[in-house]
Curated annotation (Swiss-Prot):
A GO-annotated cellular component: cytoplasm
Cellular compartment(s): Cytoplasm
Catalytic reactions of this protein: urea + 2 H2O + H(+) = hydrogencarbonate + 2 NH4(+)
Requisite cofactors: Ni cation
GO molecular function terms attached to this record: nickel cation binding; urease activity
Modification type N6-carboxylysine: residues: K222
Residue stretches in coiled coil: none
Protein's name in the database: Urease subunit alpha
Subunit architecture: Heterotrimer of UreA (gamma), UreB (beta) and UreC (alpha) subunits. Three heterotrimers associate to form the active enzyme.
Length: 573
């Protein structure tokens, strides 16, 4: 016997289904579920009087070796680069085992053989929750260890960058220089509930000092103008990167001391490179570093202080810049240096270039002009600002939803940074076989405050009420680390990314590492065309007199925002 119920009642019980629409937080971004992998009438739900019980949705006979899951997230709405769908998510051995229909094949239709719910299965209700892949932030100044929990609680599960603590070199540059510091930072990484990876110093015009850092465990090299970003340095770093299959990230030469943008591009010579804050407010050839985004070998990123362009952006940046780069307001040359980097015209253009899919990656620049806990929020604020100012994307016209725009923006802090740094086989999307790094959101809090962060298949952090309360929800509700973040579980739920060469050198044994170490691969055979939904390479020009930006000959400009969604109303407490 079947039962017909209206959509509102169905959604309240099992979450939205195909054709239903969801507003993301208080933005104007509306997504529509494209496909429902669950089976009507055979839905899974845990709780008193619900279906996940012995002999019903839970198999009475299947063992773990016969395909029983460790964890099932039921009826979840997934937002990922590949689609916006509703499905059960199955997790086993810390990895995503299935996306589809879970349950008991003896009593239910459509259950996938690798998604059996049994006595070995934990359950979490994904009804009326959105699930995204854990965020990846590739521009981290490791200044303070407290950044890591702040990032985790915002929905970031992988942090890549460099540093040694609050030394002036780290305050300004994302670099962990030399074997001794690389070893110490890899040892420190053992303590943190986060996937981590460290850049060595790429600022050297000969190869041997760079080789030894990759051999020691750096996952890539970072070139920064504060150490000198000359063509010789760029060439040497890229030669070493090609030799070891690692990525090079670059903060180019704001002062044009060793050459102009064209000289840097000639030194790069068609080799793949990840450009940081490619608009230029965070640093880079003034005034036209933004042109780098048109090259097919450049993987262009933004940092979040310029995201999105608002009425407060310019004033805030000048003060931040003086502090972060050890400048003095009493030295005229320092003030001129700061002024040259902060250009309203290029910051406004950056908004539009993100919306067009020309800029490909979002990151933070943590404590060094960027906010480590705001990568996700700033990404969706930019999407909303562009939705309001530019309307439908061409790909969304006629669909009465913003699905393509949502896929484009979520890719900027998930799959694309993973591809850029050779870790997309492990993280960056909700796909079978990848590490189960998942973030669960209530739609009204999407992009601001996650409900639960799952890391390597285990809940690692969550919003949690008073531990002395009779139920989990009484205030004060704070983000707290959960069991996945403690003891030896941490070393199995989190990974450290290193070079292939360092694994061959057996650094785990030499340094005494217990955390999973995973090699980066495929960093040198990629280009911008591999960056999903963000692969456009139009011609970009910048007028050196008034900083006007044109794309394929058309001037691009937008007004600064005076109000933003996902802002103060979410962070009063």
């Amino acid at each position: 016997m079947s039962l017909k119920i209206n959509k509102l009642k169905y959604a309240s019980m099992y979450g939205p289904t195909k054709g239903d629409k969801i507003r993301l937080a208080d933005t104007d971004i509306i997504v529509e579920i494209e496909k429902d992998f669950t089976v009507y009438g055979d839905e899974n739900k845990f709780g008193g009087g619900k279906t996940i019980r012995d002999g019903m949705a839970q198999s009475s006979t299947a063992t773990r070796d016969q395909g029983v899951l460790d964890l099932v997230i039921t009826n979840a709405t997934i937002i990922d680069h590949w689609g916006i769908v509703k499905a059960d998510i199955g997790i086993k051995d810390g990895k995503i085992a299935g996306i589809g229909k879970a349950g008991n094949p003896d009593t239910m239709d459509g259950v996938e053989p690798h998604m059996i719910i049994g006595a070995s299965t934990e359950a979490h209700g994904g009804e009326n929750l959105i699930v995204t892949a854990g965020g990846i932030d590739t521009h981290i100044h490791f200044i303070s260890p407290q950044q890591i929990e702040t990032a985790l609680y915002s929905g970031v599960t992988t942090m890549i960058g460099g540093g040694t603590g609050p030394a002036d070199g780290t305050n300004a540059t994302t670099i962990t220089p030399g074997k001794w510091y690389i070893e110490k930072m890899l040892q420190a990484a053992e303590a943190f509930p986060m996937n981590l990876g460290f850049f060595g110093k790429g600022n050297c015009s000969t190869e041997a000092p760079l080789d030894e850092q990759i051999e020691a465990g750096a996952l890539g090299l970072k070139i920064h103008e504060d150490w000198g970003a000359s063509p010789a340095v760029i060439d040497a770093s890229l030669k070493v990167a090609d030799k070891y299959d690692v990525q090079v990230a670059i903060h180019t030469d704001t002062l044009n001391e060793a050459g102009f943008l064209e000289d840097t591009m000639n030194a790069i010579n068609g080799r793949v490179i990840h450009t940081f804050h490619t608009e230029g407010a965070g640093g880079g050839h003034a005034p036209d570093i933004i042109k780098a985004a048109m090259y097919p070998n450049v993987l262009p990123a933004s940092t979040n202080p310029t995201r999105p362009y608002t009425v407060n952006t310019i004033d805030e940046h000048l003060d931040m810049l003086m502090v972060c780069h050890h400048l003095s307001k009493n030295i005229p040359e320092d003030v001129s240096f700061a002024d040259s980097r902060i250009r309203p015209e290029t910051i406004a253009a950056e908004d539009i270039l993100h919306d067009m899919g020309v800029f490909s990656i979002m990151s933070s620049d943590s404590q060094a002009m960027g906010r480590v806990g705001e990568v996700v929020t700033r990404t969706w604020q930019t999407a909303d600002k562009m939705r309001k100012q530019r309307g439908d994307l061409a790909e969304d016209k006629g669909n009465k939803n913003d699905n393509f725009r949502a896929k484009r923006y979520v890719a900027k802090y998930t799959i694309n940074p993973a591809i850029a740094h050779g870790i997309s086989q492990y993280v960056g999307s909700i796909e079978v076989g990848k590490m189960a790094d998942l973030v669960l959101w209530k739609p009204m809090l999407f992009g601001t405050k996650p409900e639960i962060i799952i890391k390597g298949g285990m809940i690692i952090a969550a919003r949690m009420g008073d531990p002395n309360a009779s139920i989990p929800t009484p205030q004060p509700v704070l983000y707290r680390n959960m069991f996945g973040a403690f003891g030896k579980a941490l070393s199995k739920t989190c990974a450290t990314f290193v070079s292939q060469a360092s694994i061959k050198n057996n650094i785990a044994e030499e340094y005494g590492l217990e955390k999973m170490i995973l090699p980066v691969t495929g960093c040198r055979n990629i280009s911008k065309k591999h960056l999903i939904h963000n692969d456009k390479t139009p011609e970009i020009t910048v007028n050196p007199e008034n900083y006007e930006v044109r794309v394929d000959g058309e001037k691009i400009i937008c007004e600064p925002a005076t109000h933003l969604p996902m802002a103060q109303r979410y962070f009063l407490f």
